[in-house]
């Protein structure tokens, strides 16, 4: 027997966690705000659905439509503009420790390295290439994560890279890592999106890998 405890239709509400209160008992707990309040709402509100799924085989949990059906229908009138694609990118070398996000002697997102990845993508029918660590601010990692989303590092020539990718028929995937510093990102967001558009980049990956400021949680109502 396989089981899953989860939730659906989680909108403007804290995520549920499970706390073991006995050998066979669990208690649902909500991730609080820094002041201990679980959820800030008016007099009338709707909680998320809480689900329990049980199946004789693990694949039954994956194949279940329960959570899908408890969520609201898609609000988009048309979805034909959504295009899935396969991509590679400069990021795994950082996790392996052979490259860095910040600009130094092992910097991963350089113009020369970008062209190598674009060549590989073009040769293997891979539509896109993602570059992490292309913009100023990675040296602040571990602090406030003050990224600048329109200033490439000096060794990352955005215009040359975009032009090279276009010649090869490869899409550039932009990257905005907030590091959890959401206020810093929101101040720059409109300008950063326009900047990408002006440079011919129309696909974006965002990241929220760092801790939120002021004790806020990724799993609380704020996140």
Short names for language-model regions:
Residues 33, 37, 45-46, 78, ...:
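Bulky hydrophobic/aromatic packing residues
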């Amino acid at each position: 027997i396989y089981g899953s405890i989860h939730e659906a239709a989680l909108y403007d509400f804290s995520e549920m966690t499970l706390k073991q209160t006995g050998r066979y008992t669990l208690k649902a707990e909500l991730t609080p705000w820094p002041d201990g309040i679980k959820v800030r709402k008016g007099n009338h509100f709707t909680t998320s659905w809480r689900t329990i799924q049980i199946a004789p085989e693990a694949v039954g949990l994956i194949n279940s439509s329960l959570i899908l059906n408890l969520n609201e229908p898609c609000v988009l009138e048309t979805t034909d503009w959504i295009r899935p694609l396969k991509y590679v990118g400069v990021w795994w070398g950082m996790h392996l420790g052979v490259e860095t996000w910040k600009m130094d002697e092992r910097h991963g997102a350089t113009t020369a390295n970008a062209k190598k990845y674009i060549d590989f993508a073009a040769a293997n029918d891979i539509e896109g290439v993602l570059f992490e660590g292309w913009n100023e601010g990675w040296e602040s990692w571990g602090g406030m994560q003050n990224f600048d989303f329109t200033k490439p590092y000096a060794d990352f020539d955005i215009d040359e890279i975009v032009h090279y990718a276009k010649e090869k028929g490869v899409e550039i995937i932009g990257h905005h890592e907030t590091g959890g510093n959401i206020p810093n990102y929101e101040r720059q967001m409109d300008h950063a999106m326009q900047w990408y558009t002006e440079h011919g980049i129309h696909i974006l990956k965002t990241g929220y890998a760092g801790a939120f400021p002021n004790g806020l949680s990724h799993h609380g109502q704020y996140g």
